[in-house]
Amino acid sequence: MQFIEVTELCGVRSAVITFRRAGSALRFVVYPMVHLGEPGFYAEVEQRLHSHDLLVVEGVAHSPAGRALSAAYRHLEGSSRLALVVQRIDLHTVGVPFINPDLTAEAVKDGWRRISLFQRALVRLLVPVYVIQMRLFGTRRVLARHLAVEEQGDVDPALNDFPDAFDELMLHSRDRLLVSAIHAIHQERCMEQILVGVIYGAEHMHAVVDALWRLGYRPCDAEWLTVFDIDPPVSLND
């Protein structure tokens, strides 16, 4: 199942998919997120969340290790070459109850310690190099190619030299927590007529859909939302 589509014509798009199960009133809506996009994408997602009854949202607790791992996209905001913003959705403004089954600061710290000192040092070296390269020479087209690779289940392209260690910390361990939360919601509320939104990075959606499928949920509706166009708009004042 495709969650992020990259084409010349439509740019980068995210597939918002609704799942339901026969005999159950509960519906899940998955929102595959990209952490760097046009403001309109995040505004559209935020607006849609108002119609939900419960949200399942990602968000690793703040920690030095977490900041190091997320620096690759955080420091690309403000780049005039990309003209994109970091994901921001004000859940308190949305006003819908939400849960955050993600890594705690202590869990990130423990996972970071399991990675060798050599690899940790390389991360701190390579992420800034990647950021500088993207700010100086990067384009939306380059970023789109990276997102097409991430669609296959990889983590941040700046960390691709260390797939095993970092996949476990930033992907698989978080997937397990997310899947556990989905199972709990199904078990406790499957007979309620509610709409549950799952707002997580697109790389986590393979685990989400696999869990929903095993529980008997099937897609019943889907639509594309544009994350960003490949070619940014040109200002007539330039």
Name each model-derived stretch.
Residues 1-173, 184, 221-232:
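Structured, acidic catalytic/metal-binding patches in enzyme active sites
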Residues 34, 202-203:
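Active-site metal-binding loops of divalent metal-dependent hydrolases
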Residues 173-190:
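A short, acidic, amphipathic alpha-helical segment used as a generic capping/interface helix at domain edges
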Residues 195-200:
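Beta-strand elements within well-structured catalytic alpha/beta cores of enzymes
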Residues 205, 209, 213, 218-238:
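Short, flexible loop segments at boundaries between secondary-structure elements
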